[in-house]
């Protein structure tokens, strides 16, 4: 299984469910609800989608880049984030550099701040919701083009979350 095939399978099983909710919208409010999961899956579609942890581990193992334990270690170490839904843990694919088969350093940097106060579900939502500090743009869309702004937004949101 290659990552390209995997990304396609995620997209194929994710029918379009409309626009991403605006900040404060309640589609993401219930982390365990089916509707919230569907909204989150749709929100990540343009950035590679989301995938189950076991699928990512199998892909990494096939490429000689790790296994389920190494994936779990990266999550526990705060290098990646995941969220749970329906007794499965899911990872947004934007966290990976698919050409180098590594975790994107920009993700590690943001997680070093937000991972202190946000759980996996909150992190997943934070990256795809329009952010006021970013003039209504989504952090996930700005990681490559305005990374310093994303870091500042993460630090501001961390401050607000922990005051």
Language model segments and positions:
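Non-transmembrane "mature" sequence context
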Residues: 1-163
């Amino acid at each position: 299984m290659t990552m390209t095939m995997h990304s396609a399978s995620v997209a194929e099983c994710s029918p379009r469910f409309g626009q991403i909710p605006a900040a404060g919208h309640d589609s993401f409010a219930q982390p365990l609800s089916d509707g919230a999961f569907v909204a989150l899956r749709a929100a990540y579609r343009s950035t590679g989608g989301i995938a189950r942890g076991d699928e990512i581990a199998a892909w990494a193992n096939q490429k000689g880049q790790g296994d389920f334990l190494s994936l779990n270690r990266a999550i526990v170490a705060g290098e990646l984030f995941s969220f749970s839904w329906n007794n499965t843990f899911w990872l947004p694919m934007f966290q990976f550099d698919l050409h180098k088969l590594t975790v994107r350093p920009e993700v590690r940097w943001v997680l070093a701040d937000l991972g202190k106060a946000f759980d996996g579900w909150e992190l997943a939502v934070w990256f795809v919701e329009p952010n006021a500090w970013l003039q209504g743009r989504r952090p996930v869309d700005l990681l490559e083009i305005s990374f310093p702004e994303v870091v500042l937004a993460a630090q501001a949101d961390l401050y607000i979350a922990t005051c």
